[in-house]
Amino acid sequence: MATVVLLLGSASLMSVPVAQADPGPGSPVPADDPFYDWDGGLDVSPGTVLRSRPMTFRTPTQPTPITGSQVLYKTTDQQGDGVVTVATVLRPLVPGPTRIVSYHMAYDALGSQCNPSYTLSGGSTSPIAGAEQAVIAGYLAAGYTVVVPDYEGEELEWTIGRQSGYAALDGIRAAQSLLQLPSSTPVGMVGYSGGSVPTQWGAEIAPEYAPELNLVGVAAGGLPVDLAHNLPYVSGNKQWAGVIPALIVAYERAYGLDLNSFVSDYGLEVIDQVDQECIAQFADDYPTLTDASMVKAPYNSLLDVPEVVAAIDDNIMGSQGTPRTPMFLAVGHADPTGDTIMITGDVQGLAYAYCGRGVDVQYAQYDGLTHSEAFPVFEAQSLQFLTERFAGGPTHSNCVTIPPGNALTPTS
């Protein structure tokens, strides 16, 4: 890390008014920080910067000399309403033309203490965040401008597709505005696991929502393509069963579900426990939790509940648009179903469907690797993929060899 840090420099602060001082360790969490609140009007275009402040990039072990900006900007929620969120914008010292990487951390949060903007400024950390901070440092060392959005939004709506994609695309717009860059500036997007949600959805909705952005390549790994398939896979899984109540919290926030109408007493108790946690806390805390234990009669599964199924169907990847940029899609394959949490056949199915629509897809399957083990392999291949895309090199589509995978049809 020390070698990387020596290669990095300071971000330029542009003309957007600075709201307050650099938020270092000891700063309030975003939920209690006035910087994140906006009580003004939102009759402005998505991606408009509403306020900014300087920040210092801090790793889990030390501060760095890298400075950047946090920007509060307008974006759009799942229902199409105007909302705000924050992105972190970091600039390299390495000279050369500006190339933007929108990096989407897998913060998988129900509480704001895990927001990337808070983590990157030294507010909190975890092993997952630490690994991703090292990846971000690598992109900066390679000369990329890096934008890291809090894509779950103010309400921490985890896995919600369109909203996450909107936040990612508007974060790029906000960074371009802050740095006074033209919309023709080349942009790549990358994210793994939870970070694949804004990445894939951003690529899918960009042609309609942000057609002016110059997306040159998108890399997404470990994707939750259709959660109707993931729920039975993680039910009773000692490592991942805790994601089930967390998903219900996210759906309640995004869709206003009436939890008392279908959640069991035990389910309500667990939901209350995970309500403000992040994945490092809740994923493996409930090794005996099952899908069936979360619901009450007359239901035997969350997939029996029409409101839950409707929410899941609204977030099936590949269902609401077609990317117009080369895609790198990857997944581990540790057992006959998937990587222990993501479904290999679902990622195959998404890649195959995109190929059928004319998308240039490079698919990678990491046989024998779990979800966690596949992360560093994916990140290395993503860097190579994006480096080639920014350089204008040839693509390496393997559409002709991608299996059809699973059908991605709505459950309802």
Please identify what each model-predicted range represents.
Residues 1-21:
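Secretory targeting and sorting signals
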Residues 86-91, 97-121, 137, 218:
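Short beta-strand element of the alpha/beta-hydrolase
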Residues 173-241:
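Primarily recognizes the serine-hydrolase "nucleophile elbow" in alpha/beta-hydrolase
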